[in-house]
Amino acid sequence: MAISTVQPDRRSAANHRAPVLAGLRGNPWWTLAAVSVGVIMVGLDASVVAIANPRIAADLSASLPDLQWITDSYLLALASLLIFGGKLGDMLGRKRVFLLGVIGFAVASVGIGLIGTVSGVIALRAIQGVFGALLMPSTLAIVRSTFPPERLNTAIGIWGAASGVSVAAGPILGGILVEHYSWESVFYINVPIAVIAVVL
């Protein structure tokens, strides 16, 4: 009696991977550019607000504890919801959650510039952190699912560099924007960044 062996179908594995890639733009380097722009947006807002705080205090009569909450509400929401953001990406689709995070982050940024009250700024900074927590885990997951193993380390290195550079560049960019425009501009700058991430 002949014994039949079942060979693993490599095409089925490729087809399983295809839906992830099909939702992303064809070239993986464009995909990396898009998610890196999203990472830059989140990193900038972690550090840029420190430069804007004196102007915020002057314009909105914010106290020192208020200014601390403007910084901390964002960081707390971002850090505490990263795992939730990753699980949501697994359930709903990484690209979808990434785009939701980018768009929500930009809308919250505009709201911060327009709201005109300290409590409103604190609340919207927390909302910024929520949307940042949605997009951040999806960026790395998208990179991992897009690049083949031989290019993955390079891609992750670029992704990590984008995060580090954005945090370091925040005070520099914030100083330029606050000096030449207004404190609101450090949040409005997220809108063109978000547009670039969505278009790519």
Regions found by a protein language model. Give the residues of each.
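Transmembrane-helix bundle of Major Facilitator Superfamily
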Residues: A2-L200
